């Protein structure tokens, strides 16, 4: 059946998932031909592309918040979504209604010349929606790698690299040097590049030099430091002192501030401070607040006052696990209880690398099953954990909420329950608390 602009979004998404013979098929030829035909390669007067292993989402969010507070019209394309596809395209900090997406999908479908992957289709649709909205700035979050990612059909004015670590090795290579080369594919000749990774592989620096990019590197051109009450950011011209703590990692906030220095907009220090206080993104070391704690208590049939501290995080690789370990270690100084993990991970992720950072701080593990062709069972994950770290206490459950229920039953008020390991893990939990 031919889908129409008025067909339900769920039907369109099902169609997108099946529209190409491979779910991931890196390359720019298919998508670029459609984008050129529809004149989608220039979605706004200024475009920022953000790549990196971790930290892309929070860096994009702070850049978006700053630019909106400066009074600009801003669009953001990000992935993956947590609960609803609509989260992937934001215009003026608003998700678009289903009808906007289905109309855009129909337009792309009518004009495509060959089959497209889900991500290629959604990228073209986002660019079409941005162009219709007449924006000042578009922020594109890279989906996978950079050089061959669908977002790379657009020549951005500023490239941002948040971090570099080993992930997606089937597509990007199994060394930091190979991965850095792929991520450097978003660089453009004579355009500025901001790098938030402190240990930059030479392959990335070589690519920047080859293209005559103006590079702004962490700990070389700019730096940040934090203390118990606030933090500071500085480069060779600007020093921002007594900055407010924010709800995203300092390294990502600092990278966004470095990117702001490269923009052609005169953004005030007041706007930066206001934005740091406002910025937040679901699933990034996020403590569950009172209203959602009540929903969890109702769901489990327990008094809300008996619930422990509950934190969710989408971290799913060793680099993210290291950050989690640091945050949990700091938290442990202020509580008296145990650290309990509810962990669900996709089978193509480096689970042992994640466990290595977290087993010293986690007192008990509940490994849970994730569905889908990339999912793995809680039993498989628990076996991996116990085979490499035989001293740990680990059980398995058939779903995220089964694991959460088991963990919360064993926890007391001063404990911490961490739900993490994948966007899918957090999404399954979040669907209940929302």
Model segments located where?
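Charged, amphipathic alpha-helical linker segments immediately N-terminal to NTP-binding catalytic cores
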Residues: 1-22
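Hydrophobic anchor at the beta1->P-loop junction of P-loop NTPases
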Residues: 48-50
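Hydrophobic positions on the alpha1 helix immediately C-terminal to the Walker A/P-loop
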Residues: 58-62
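Extended acidic/charged loop-beta regions that coordinate divalent cations
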Residues: 125-171, 205-239
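Nucleotide phosphate-binding/pyrophosphate-handling subdomain across enzymes
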Residues: 132, 137-140, 150-160, 164-168, ...
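Internal gly/pro-rich beta-alpha loop/helix module
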Residues: 171-186, 191-258
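C-terminal helical cap/extension that packs against the catalytic core
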Residues: 194, 198-203, 210-212, 225-228, ...
């Amino acid at each position: 059946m031919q889908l129409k602009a008025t067909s339900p979004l769920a039907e369109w998404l099902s169609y997108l998932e099946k529209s190409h013979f491979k779910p991931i098929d890196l390359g720019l030829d298919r998508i670029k031909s459609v984008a050129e035909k529809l004149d989608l390669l220039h979605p706004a007067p200024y475009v920022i592309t953000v790549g990196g292993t971790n930290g892309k989402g929070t860096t994009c969010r702070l850049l978006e918040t700053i630019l909106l507070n400066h009074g600009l019209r801003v669009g953001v394309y990000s992935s993956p979504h947590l609960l609803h596809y609509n989260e992937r395209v934001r215009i003026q900090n608003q998700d678009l209604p289903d009808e906007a997406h289905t109309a855009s999908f129909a337009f792309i479908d009518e004009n495509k010349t060959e089959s497209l992957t889900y991500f290629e289709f959604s990228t073209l649709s986002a660019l079409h929606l941005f162009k219709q909205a007449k924006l000042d700035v578009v922020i594109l979050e890279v989906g996978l790698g950079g050089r061959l990612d669908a977002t790379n059909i657009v020549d951005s004015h500023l490239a941002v690299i948040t971090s570099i670590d080993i992930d997606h090795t089937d597509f990007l290579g199994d060394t930091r040097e190979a991965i850095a080369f792929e991520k450097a594919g978003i660089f453009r000749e004579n355009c500025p590049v901001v790098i938030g990774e402190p240990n930059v592989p030479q392959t990335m620096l070589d690519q920047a030099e080859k293209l005559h990019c103006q590079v702004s590197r962490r700990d070389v051109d700019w730096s940040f430091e934090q203390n118990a009450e606030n933090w500071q950011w500085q480069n060779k011209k600007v020093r921002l002192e007594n900055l407010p703590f924010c709800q995203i990692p300092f390294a990502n906030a600092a990278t966004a501030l470095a990117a702001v220095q490269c923009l052609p907009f005169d953004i005030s220090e007041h706007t930066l401070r206001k934005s740091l206080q406002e910025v937040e993104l679901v699933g990034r070391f996020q403590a569950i607040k009172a209203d959602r704690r009540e929903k969890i208590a109702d769901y489990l049939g327990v008094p809300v006052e008996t619930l422990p501290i509950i934190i969710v995080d989408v971290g799913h690789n060793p680099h993210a696990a290291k950050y989690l370990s640091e945050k949990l270690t700091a938290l442990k100084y202020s509580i008296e209880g145990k650290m309990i993990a509810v962990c669900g991970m996709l089978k193509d992720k480096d689970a042992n690398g994640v466990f290595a950072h977290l087993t010293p701080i986690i007192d008990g593990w509940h490994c849970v099953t994730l569905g889908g062709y990339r999912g793995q069972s809680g039993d498989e994950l628990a076996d991996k954990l116990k085979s490499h770290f035989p001293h740990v206490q680990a059980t398995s459950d058939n779903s995220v909420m089964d694991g959460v229920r088991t963990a919360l039953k064993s926890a007391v008020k001063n404990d911490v329950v961490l739900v993490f390991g994948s966007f899918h893990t957090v999404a399954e939990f979040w669907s209940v608390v929302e």
